[in-house]
Amino acid sequence: MWSIGLFADYDGTLVPPEETRKAPGPPEAVDAALRELSKYIKFAVVTSKACDFVKSRIPYAHGYGCINGIEIAAGGYVAVAEDLNRELEKLSLVFKQLDVYVEEKWTSTGVLAGVTIDWRDGGKPPVLLERVLAEAESRGLFVLRYGRHPFVDIYASRRNKGDAVRILKSLLGLDYVVYLGDSENDRPAWEVADVKILVRHSYNSHIKTKGLLPIHIEELPAYLQEVLRAVAEASQ
């Protein structure tokens, strides 16, 4: 195998942001290309989702960076950040009272490490959202806001996707990493990647492309097929 790896975010990158909660995995064309690519190069998913969520949808990846870098799984090993703030669990009932979709992200060791408060269905953020976020920050939790995405993330650690990329790059024995992402939480990963790709869609037109290679999400299958052809030919 080559010493180059392809790492990608899940929500809004491999799966359109409107379909993340209901989709059983990436679109068929994307999934097929990734399955073939994983036979030639190392492929990893670096996501804000929990590992059990993404592993069930992309079981063929060589590595996973989950819950925004809090949990790493690769090569038969699993590592979870040691600095998890248990105040997140204490606030979980408060989050659920906001009357919007709340996604809890649990580590494989059974600790609540992340929460997404998502108002995509309602169109407007909850009235008490800012008060709740202020309380979370006062307790030392990491609140991650997005420019135009209709959700906010709260984490029990300040680990990030850049940490996940560095660790997975080392565990998988890679010299170079191509990283595909779409939002603010991908910036730390882009910073440490060798090739930085921004997947464009309706929620992220505000993100500047300086230093990034933009690809529209509808063009992703064709891009992956192009990469697949290149690595397949080079391996012959």
What are the roles of these predicted feature ranges?
Residues 2-20, 190:
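Asp-based phosphoryl-transfer active-site loop
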Residues 101-193, 207:
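Conserved acidic, metal-coordinating active-site core of Asp-based
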